[in-house]
């Protein structure tokens, strides 16, 4: 029941590049970002603290860092453009913020795909925040 509530809340807040991020994850990792990565480990989902728990959680940590480096941008709302060329995602457009956000999302989706074998829902799905108290490493 708690999972359904979280999914409903997340869907209400999805706009702009968050929906595009979901589409990139589905395209590259062949899984739903909102379902599989919205409440995983210490960094996948809203916020993030502590140390990444595994390679999948590290994808989210690096993604958070990437968004943090996109100064002057609004990564969760900046709508970007991308295309597919020879099976690769190519971020486009003239706006540097939107292109940077696209590159962050693309890198995370590729990271999820490349680390599918580390995804451990029994241990890290709905991981309690109290287990994420270690000092975080720098971006």
From Swiss-Prot:
EC number assigned by the record: 3.1.1.4
InterPro entries: PLipase_A2 (IPR001211), PLipase_A2_Asp_AS (IPR033112), PLipase_A2_dom (IPR016090), PLipase_A2_dom_sf (IPR036444), PLipase_A2_His_AS (IPR033113)
Subunit organization: Monomer.
Residues in the signal sequence: 1-16
Name of this chain's protein: Acidic phospholipase A2 Tgc-E6
Reaction equation(s) it catalyzes: a 1,2-diacyl-sn-glycero-3-phosphocholine + H2O = a 1-acyl-sn-glycero-3-phosphocholine + a fatty acid + H(+)
An MF annotation (GO) of this entry: phospholipase A2 activity
GO terms under biological process: arachidonate secretion; lipid catabolic process; negative regulation of T cell proliferation; phospholipid metabolic process; venom-mediated suppression of platelet aggregation
Coarse class of the protein's main subcellular location: secreted
Disulfide-bond pairs as recorded: 42-132, 44-60, 59-111, 65-139, 66-104, 73-97, 91-102
Binding site for Ca(2+): 43, 45, 47, 64
Described function: Snake venom phospholipase A2 (PLA2) that inhibits the ADP-(IC(50)=272 nM) and collagen-induced (IC(50)=518 nM) human platelet aggregation in platelet rich plasma. Exhibits very high hydrolytic activities toward the synthetic lecithin, and prefers the anionic micelles (dPPC with deoxycholate) to the zwitterionic micelles (dPPC with Triton X-100). PLA2 catalyzes the calcium-dependent hydrolysis of the 2-acyl groups in 3-sn-phosphoglycerides.
Family: Belongs to the phospholipase A2 family. Group II subfamily. D49 sub-subfamily.
Annotated compartments: Secreted
